[in-house]
Regions:
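Multi-pass alpha-helical membrane architecture of UbiA-family
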Residues: 1-309
């Protein structure tokens, strides 16, 4: 039992849990405040923060891991080359018991979400459908990242519905489309750099396998131009400027790690970059969470120290 739990937790890739949890937090910030896109300002409303927010954050954190079990099974052909030491590939983690645990976990999230608001089921179903579509479209460059981005962004919509008891409104949907979706697109795009060898062998087409220079251009220019635009619109607000410098530095370091085939450290940095991008507009209120998340991701990567896993 302990052996199964150990390999199940490793297969959950807990560091990615902070990506979905942070997406939930971004959704909660939208529900708890009013975001002015012209002034790039976020103002808290009277909606109180409660244990329900904490419950939604926990759901977001574990949702990635529960789903990752199914993804590992579907991707075992590519993983046999890219990550041959993963428990699902080596046989250390038995599929059926792992599927059962994940199914129960996802069902618990669905029930808890429904009790908060029936709207949550719609976004849970949409995210699940898009995740299946992503698995089927992995061989289609750009579209694969776009579908993935919309799938994970459903976490923010799930959070808004769960805490506010309503469907997300127009400005909230616009923010998700303008910022949260691109942040996840970038993370998915960056994740393919480490998989070039296995993807080529398995016939998976990504920008990294067919147009590597374009892939690098997207990885560097998109986040840098995004934060530059926000700084220009905010007349170089000090907080945003400092955070922008950090983001640009992480982008540069990420590319250096990739160029030296240091993919394990690059994956860690990719996670941290995504967390910062998601919280970019709300950093004044979420800076403590951001620091804890970045440190936790770094520490978790010490446990996941096998680059082939």
């Amino acid at each position: 039992m302990l052996k199964f739990l150990y390999y199940y937790l490793r297969s959950m890739r807990l560091y990615y849990g902070f990506v979905t949890a942070t997406t939930v937090l971004a959704g909660l910030c939208l529900a708890h405040g009013t975001y002015n896109e012209l002034k790039l300002s976020w103002t808290l409303t009277d909606l109180p923060w409660t244990l329900r927010d904490a419950a939604l954050l926990a759901m977001g954190f574990f949702a990635w891991g529960f789903n990752q079990i199914f993804s590992d099974w579907c991707d075992r052909k590519e993983d046999a080359i890219n990550a041959p030491h993963r428990p699902m590939v080596t046989g250390a983690l038995k599929p059926l018991p792992a599927f059962a645990v994940s199914a129960v976990g996802l069902a618990a999230i669905a029930v808890a979400g429904y009790l908060m608001s029936p709207w949550t089921l719609a976004f849970l179903a949409l995210g699940g459908a898009l995740n299946i579509a992503y698995s089927l479209l992995k061989r289609v460059p750009v579209l694969n990242c776009l579908v993935y981005a919309y799938a994970i962004s459903c976490c923010a919509l799930f959070a808004i519905a769960g805490i506010a008891g309503r469907c997300p409104n127009g400005p909230e949907l616009e923010f998700v489309g303008d910022w949260i979706v691109p942040a996840h697109f970038l993370m998915c795009h960056n994740s393919y750099f480490k998989d070039v060898e296995g993807d080529r062998a398995a016939g998976v087409r990504t920008l990294q396998t067919i147009w590597p220079r374009v892939a690098k251009f997207v990885s560097v220019c998109c986040p840098c131009l995004a934060v530059l635009r926000l700084n220009f619109l905010s007349w170089f607000n000090v907080e945003l400027f400092v955070l922008s410098v950090i983001v640009v530095a992480l982008v540069i370091v990420f590319q250096r790690l990739v160029s030296h085939s240091m993919f394990h450290r690059a994956t860690c940095l990719n996670c941290q970059l995504c967390v910062l991008m998601l919280l970019f507009h709300f950093i004044a209120a979420t800076w403590l969470y951001a620091i804890v998340s970045l440190v936790a991701i770094q520490l978790l990567f010490l446990w996941y120290n096998d680059e082939k896993e």
